[in-house]
A protein has these predicted regions:
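Short alpha-helical "patches" and their helix-cap loops
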Residues: 24-28, 189-201, 222-226
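Hydrophobic/aromatic-lined pockets within catalytic cores
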Residues: 15, 19, 180, 184-185, ...
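Short hydrophobic "helix-edge" motifs at membrane interfaces and signal-peptide entry regions
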Residues: 49-50, 161-163, 249
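C-terminal accessory segment of soluble enzyme catalytic cores
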Residues: 210-269
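Phosphate/anion-contacting hairpin/loop surfaces
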Residues: 70-185, 190-193, 197, 202-203, ...
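Acidic, proline/glycine-enriched N-terminal capping motif
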Residues: 1-130, 262
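Residue-level marker of motif borders
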Residues: 54, 167-168, 254
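Basic, amphipathic alpha-helical segments enriched in Lys/Arg and hydrophobic/aromatic residues
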Residues: 198-215
């Protein structure tokens, strides 16, 4: 599942593919997808052109829509298990495209491709139930953790707490495993005990890891949907060296309450 780095790279790809001079004039939805189409009749005039820019916050991706005359609005995307964007010709639309924004010339489109169909889209804004982005809103994020240290969620095991987007928006399986390994602390302790053990170190490493993953190309474990196509051998080697715990054959693993696999050092068994 795409995590913070992969979602941010997706936003980068959209902004590189869709120039500020490019205009769009409608959308297309694959009828096989059960999610409802976007009803733009209340936010756009008939045949009104609009611009698109992307930004990310944790695991959320926002496409800001700026119409020629109507008020700006946003379309929120979650990428699901492996959704990604491409930009290409309408006539060469990828098989698993489920939603697209059509350019004015009618020949090209910004395509949301999602083989497993877990991705979602809707008109809206950032989800208030998700935490600040720890890489760009560090102070707000760390303050939120400390001010809520006695919340019932922090009484749960640390490895479960890390997957709760209410507290760490952007973390998923590989970031969880890597953070636990680098902290070198028992991941089965209550989250509040791990966090309070060395709060500054916890915050620093938790915020640094997704930034490192981003600069390594968003994780070669997702090379099949990396929109920027980072495939250089040197980057792959750097990524493999960076990854210490996730899918490490020498580590223990278990299935958590959410059905996700967690890798951890054998000494914590």
């Amino acid at each position: 599942m795409p995590e913070l780095a992969e979602v941010r790279l997706t936003g980068d790809f959209i902004n590189q593919s869709v120039t500020e001079e490019m205009s769009f004039i409608g959308t297309w939805k694959n009828p096989v997808h059960k999610l409802a189409d976007l009803d733009l009749t209340n936010v756009l005039l008939p045949d009104e052109e609009f611009k698109i820019r992307a930004e990310s916050r944790g695991k959320e991706l926002k496409l800001s829509i700026t119409p020629q005359e109507s008020h700006p609005f946003s379309v929120m995307f979650t990428l699901g298990m492996g959704g990604h964007f491409s930009f290409g010709e309408v006539q060469e639309r990828p098989k698993h495209t489920h939603f697209s924004f059509l350019t004015v010339d009618g020949e090209r489109e910004l395509q949301f491709v999602d083989i497993r169909r877990f991705g979602r889209w809707k008109i809206g804004d950032w989800n208030p139930d998700r935490s600040p982005d720890l890489t760009i809103e560090f102070e707000a994020w760390s303050r939120n953790i400390m001010e809520n240290i006695h919340h019932k969620d922090l009484a749960k095991p640390f490895y479960e707490f890390l997957m709760n987007q209410k507290w760490i928006n952007g973390y998923g399986n590989y970031l969880r495993a890597e953070l636990c390994e680098r902290l070198d602390i028992n991941p089965f302790w209550a989250a509040k005990d791990v966090v309070r053990y060395d709060f500054e170190r916890f915050c620093e490493i938790a915020a640094r890891l997704p930034i490192e993953a981003y600069f390594l190309g968003g994780g070669q474990i997702y090379s099949w949907n990396n929109p920027l196509g980072v495939t250089r051998d040197s980057v792959v080697q750097e990524w493999n060296q960076w990854m210490k715990a996730y899918k490490n054959p020498g580590f223990e693993n278990l299935i958590d309450n959410g059905g996700r696999r967690f890798w951890y050092h054998p000494k914590w068994k």
